[in-house]
A protein has these predicted regions:
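Short linear motifs centered on Gly/Pro in flexible linkers and helix caps
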Residues: 1-5, 29, 98
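Charge-rich, low-complexity N-terminal segments
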Residues: 1-16
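A generic structural signal for ordered secondary structure
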Residues: 8, 12, 37-40, 56, ...
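N-terminal regions of proteins, emphasizing targeting and processing segments when present
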Residues: 15, 48-52, 60, 76, ...
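Short, surface-exposed loop motifs enriched in S/T, G, D/E and P with embedded aromatic residues
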Residues: 17-22
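Ampiphathic alpha-helical segments that act as solvent-exposed interaction surfaces
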Residues: 69-115
Length: 115
C-alpha cells in the first residue's frame, strides 16, 4: 500500500495521531472491505467504496463479530480522479497532485481471496 508523505501527514493532522501503521483488513457492516491502521490509542479505517473512492474514519472493532468494524467519527473521503488525489474532511477538500494513494495490489489480493 502506498500513501505519499504529503497525504499521510495531512491524515495524521486531521485525526490528530502520530502513528499510522497498516495492520490488516476488516469489513464494514455493509461488507465493504477496509484497511485497518494502528495509530497508537486510535484505530483508523480506509473503507473501499470503489476502486477510486474511499471513506476514512476512526473505527472500533465489533467484538461480537470479530473482523467487522463500525465508524466512531463521521466519514471523510478520499477520491482519486483526473491525476489528483482529494481528501475531503468536514466539507473542505485538500487536493494533492498525482496519485498520493494506491492500494491496487491489496485490492487484487482481496479479490483473489473472494474467488
Amino acid at each position: 500500500m502506498y500513501i505519499r508523505d504529503d497525504l499521510l501527514n495531512k491524515i495524521k493532522e486531521v485525526f490528530n495521531v502520530k502513528e499510522f501503521t497498516y495492520i490488516r483488513t476488516g469489513k464494514y457492516y455493509n461488507n465493504n472491505d477496509m484497511f485497518i491502521f494502528d495509530c497508537g490509542n486510535e484505530t483508523i479505517a480506509i473503507e473501499v467504496e470503489t476502486a477510486n473512492f474511499f471513506s476514512i474514519y476512526k473505527t472500533k472493532e465489533n467484538f461480537d463479530h470479530p473482523g467487522y468494524f463500525y465508524a466512531v467519527t463521521q466519514k471523510n473521503f478520499l477520491l482519486i480522479k483526473d491525476n489528483k488525489t482529494r481528501l475531503r474532511v468536514d466539507g473542505e477538500t485538500t487536493t494533492f497532485p498525482g496519485n498520493a494513494f494506491d492500494c491496487t495490489s491489496e485490492l487484487v489480493l482481496l479479490a483473489m481471496e473472494k474467488s
